[in-house]
Amino acid sequence: MNYDNYWDEDKPELNITPLVDVMLVLLAILMVTTPTLTYKEEIALPSGSKTARATQDKMIEIRMDKDAKIYIDSQTYEYNSFPDTFNLLSKKYDKDTRVSIRADKRLTYDKVIYLLKTIKEAGFLKVSLITSP
């Protein structure tokens, strides 16, 4: 009897498919959990002041009624003289101040555009229209 042939035929083969499957699952878990780890690094942040935040929160609200009268706070302005008056008034404010316009829905489109153009010409960059449902 030839023993060499016997052992050659019955050699066990190593099936690596389950091993690869397990390794791929572990790799996927590692890739998902790695970004969630937090690293603690000492970072020296600059100190800020609270006054800078308070000045940014300032806003000018301009209201225009159906008769084209313009209101800023408690002051009333006429439609035709508003550009000159607003240019003088705008010198008190920083040009980065937010300006909100609340116009009556019965106004014509031209009057609201005129108001927007006046505010933009005064140098204000952050102008928005307020609408209500």
Curated annotation (Swiss-Prot):
For this UniProt record, the keywords arranged alphabetically read as follows:
Cell inner membrane, Cell membrane, Membrane, Protein transport, Transmembrane, Transmembrane helix, Transport
Task: List all membrane-crossing ranges.
Answer: 16-32
Q: Which residues lie on this side of the membrane: Periplasmic?
A: 33-133
One of this protein's Pfam families, by short name? ExbD
The places in or outside the cell where this protein is found are:
Cell inner membrane
Against InterPro entries, the record matches this protein to: ExbD
Name the Gene Ontology biological process terms.
Answer: protein transport
Q: How does it sit in the membrane?
A: Single-pass type II membrane protein
Q: Which GO terms describe its cellular component?
A: plasma membrane
Residues exposed to the Cytoplasmic side: 1-15
Q: Could you give a GO molecular-function term held by this entry?
A: transmembrane transporter activity
Family membership: Belongs to the ExbD/TolR family.
Q: What is this protein called?
A: Putative biopolymer transport protein ExbD-like 1
* Protein source organism: Helicobacter pylori (strain ATCC 700392 / 26695)
